[in-house]
Design a protein with these regions (language model features):
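Short amphipathic alpha-helical segments
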Residues: 49-72, 106
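Glycine-rich beta-strand-turn "strand-cap" elements at beta-sheet edges
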Residues: 6, 22-37, 74-81, 111-136
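Short, well-ordered beta-strand segments in beta-rich or mixed alpha/beta enzyme
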Residues: 37-44, 72-102, 127
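Bacterial N-terminal signal peptides that target proteins for export
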Residues: 1-10
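An amphipathic, aromatic/His-enriched active-site/gating alpha helix that lines ligand/cofactor pockets
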Residues: 67-71, 90-125
Length: 136
């Protein structure tokens, strides 16, 4: 008498768990909180100094890529005003970024050299990941 009930209960539980797992993997949303630090660095240059600024940033990023805790950097250019340059950086250690990274010789040199091709100090903001959304 209990066999049909147990079989039905097991079937029901497996169906619910399968449905929940499927919904989570196909929702287009991934609760992806982690300890990574996301940094947005906004630079302003002039039209005349644009190529020099991009070249110097390229050289800097080649050195930064060798650092521990580096994940990636994306350089974005404003299509409406190419004198606006944005670095979208990802690091797996906030302490490293705010500490040792800021003291590296290549970054210190860039900060001095940038005075000749960057208009003022950059706007820097720090972010943490909450979710990732992707196409279904």
């Amino acid at each position: 008498m209990l066999k049909p009930f147990i079989s039905t209960a097991i079937f029901f539980v497996l169906t619910v768990f399968t449905s929940v797992a499927f919904a989570q993997t196909n929702s287009g949303t991934n609760n992806a909180e982690n300890d990574d630090l996301y940094v947005l660095v906004k630079y302003k240059t002039t039209e005349q100094k644009f190529d020099e600024a991009v070249s110097a940033l390229d050289a800097l990023i080649l050195e930064v890529k060798k650092e521990p805790h580096f994940v990636n950097i994306k350089m974005l250019i404003d299509p409406a005003d190419r004198t606006n340059i944005l670095l979208y950086e990802q690091w797996n250690s906030e302490a490293y970024y705010k500490g040792d990274h800021m003291g590296t010789p290549h970054l210190q040199k860039f900060m001095i050299d940038a005075r000749s091709f960057i208009a003022g100090p950059p706007d820097i903001s720090f972010w943490k990941l909450k979710n990732i959304y992707s196409a279904d």
